[in-house]
Design a protein with these regions (language model features):
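Ligand-binding clefts of soluble mixed alpha/beta catalytic domains
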Residues: 1-199
Length: 199
């Protein structure tokens, strides 16, 4: 880290500012953050258990959700007994979770709001991760599609979005969409039968 800072003419004492937690979250390198080592160890064990396909969580797959008003409510209703563990927490419209549904591991991708470059990158990474472990995807969508902003165009949103579409189209894992609202690009990427979704 100090070599990177020195090369850019920054003071090595500013390592936390430029290379710390906030920078790792912003770049997408950090997936989870915990206040203490004990909690971190427990969550690592949870993630490894999830990736291995084991589940010790019992829940009724036919339960009726009492009140589902938001995307986060829907995620809670779909997942067994609050098993959803959010990974790659950030301010994006897209949230990603490891969870169990009827005892089986699933990846849950929820979108509430317009899709930006940050969202497309996050979706691509998550779909590729699920593919590596043969984990089904559940998308929960409430989105009007692309954020039509000049700054998104300048960042190359079309190219970044195309990479997310490619990852989704190449994924052979089962995909199920839960739709509140999916318009344009959001529908095509996160719910369309043509890209492999059922709903």
């Amino acid at each position: 880290p100090s070599a990177v800072l020195a090369k850019d003419g920054k003071n090595p004492s500013d390592a936390k500012k430029y290379l710390g937690k906030d920078a790792a979250e912003k770049s997408g390198v950090a997936a989870l953050e915990y206040a203490d080592v004990a909690t971190l160890k427990n969550q690592i064990a949870s993630v490894l258990t999830f990736l291995s396909g084991e589940s010790k969580i019992a829940d009724n797959p036919n339960k009726v959700a009492k009140k589902v008003e938001s995307v986060s409510d829907a995620v809670g209703a779909i997942c067994d007994n609050g098993s959803a563990l959010e990974i790659s927490c950030d301010e994006a419209a897209t949230k990603t979770y490891f969870a169990y549904a009827d005892g089986a591991p699933v990846g849950v991708l929820s979108v509430e709001g317009e899709l930006t470059c940050k969202d497309f990158r996050k979706i691509k990474r998550f779909v590729n991760l699920l593919d590596a472990y043969n984990i089904p995807l559940v998308s929960v969508v409430d989105s009007d599609g692309f954020a039509a902003r000049l700054k998104c165009e300048e960042k190359g949103v079309a190219k970044i979005a195309a990479e997310a579409y490619t990852a989704m189209a190449l994924s052979e894992n089962p995909k199920i969409a839960v739709i509140k609202n999916a318009i344009g690009g959001a529908y095509a990427l996160l719910a369309a039968k043509e890209i492999g979704f059922n709903y």
